[in-house]
Amino acid sequence: MHTKDIKKIVLAYSGGLDTSAIIPWLKEHYGNCEVVAFVADVGQSREDLEGVEQKALRSGASECHVVDLREEFIKDYVYPVLKTGALYEGSYLLGTSMARPIIAKAQVELALKVGADALAHGATGKGNDQVRFESTYTALAPQLKVVAPWREWDLRSREALLDYLKARDIPTTATLEKIYSRDENAWHISTEGGVLESTWNASNKDCWVWTVDPEEAPDEAELVSVMIEKGEVVGVNGKVMSPYQCLEALNILGVKHGIGRIDIVENRLVGMKSRGCYETPGGTIMMAALRGVEQLVLDRDSFKWRQQLGLEMSYVVYDGRWFAPLRRSIQAAAETLAADVSGEVVLKLYKGQVTAIQKRSTNSLYSEAFATFGEDEVYDHSHAAGFIRLYSLPSRIRALNSKE
């Protein structure tokens, strides 16, 4: 890439150490180009956003745009994935993975608006995020150039980044003592690095940011009612709210009771394994509530296919293919399956556990008359004999043939 060809870059900016260093680095290495900082508000800590515009300008940005994406993030990105029941490798609720496409999409929109000719991000060359950002850029604005400083510069350590900023009199709150890498949005917070880099080290209290240690959570369980309409959470404890408000309400309860902690080793798209501690309190409660209604409403084959959709969706989202046709197809199928998934679930929150203890739906296929262990007048037990004979016919034929 010819650096002189780039006049204006829109950078996905967080205000952290890496992106604070990227602003002056871009100006130094790309012909003193103009750098516009873009900050996506996806529900991260308000402290992270406080003063972020001034910080970007002090680092050398010509402008800083903070865009509120919270409601859109939950409604148009989290809910479609939740509807499929997607869990990457069986446990990860895809908090970071779902946030990247909406951030990159809004970044592209700003770049087109301000007349930029390039996009930049602070993802490292080891991680998945570089793929997620750049796949979105390519899908939405292939004409824009892409700059990935971590794949170009020689600043390979936290100490080097701090020295780089100090030499240019750019203030930062980062220190060498902040050894963990974290990503936060309304759905979750992840912690990587530090003691977690050895899988033989147990996580410690510094690895958990939001949630109360389940052992220190209240000794008394708390009940919460969640309302579902067509596979989406629409209310909490009888109050109808927006998707983001529902998540906020459930996050508060989940944090209090230590809900939604996982400590996992996952397979990254780029080939290596990584370890992280993830906290998804409200999302874990939402998933349990949705599963409760699905158990009532979906027949056996429908539920099996919903599971298949969730498995495939988990890889599509994790791998950064949000804007691929396959994601849209999976989402369309999930919405069809969720058309009757409406109802109410009461869940018990207690020391890290969430349990659905009551559930109801006007579309329920559960029939107490058929399911009872007591005497009933609707189910003829003798009918089972013919069903079993036909169901097991292949096994019968195989056994008979083996004796010949």
From Swiss-Prot:
InterPro entries: Arginosuc_syn_C, Arginosuc_syn_N, Arginosuc_synth, Arginosuc_synth_CS, Arginosuc_synth_type_1_subfam, AS_cat/multimer_dom_body, Rossmann-like_a/b/a_fold. It is an enzyme of class 6 (ligase). Keywords: Amino-acid biosynthesis, Arginine biosynthesis, ATP-binding, Cytoplasm, Ligase, Nucleotide-binding. Signal peptide: none annotated. Gene3D superfamilies: Argininosuccinate synthetase, chain A, domain 2 (3.90.1260.10), HUPs (3.40.50.620), Single helix bin (1.20.5.470). L-citrulline binds at Y92, S97, N128, R132, S181, S190, E266, Y278. The keyword Nucleotide-binding applies. Belongs to the argininosuccinate synthase family. Type 1 subfamily. Homotetramer. This is Argininosuccinate synthase.
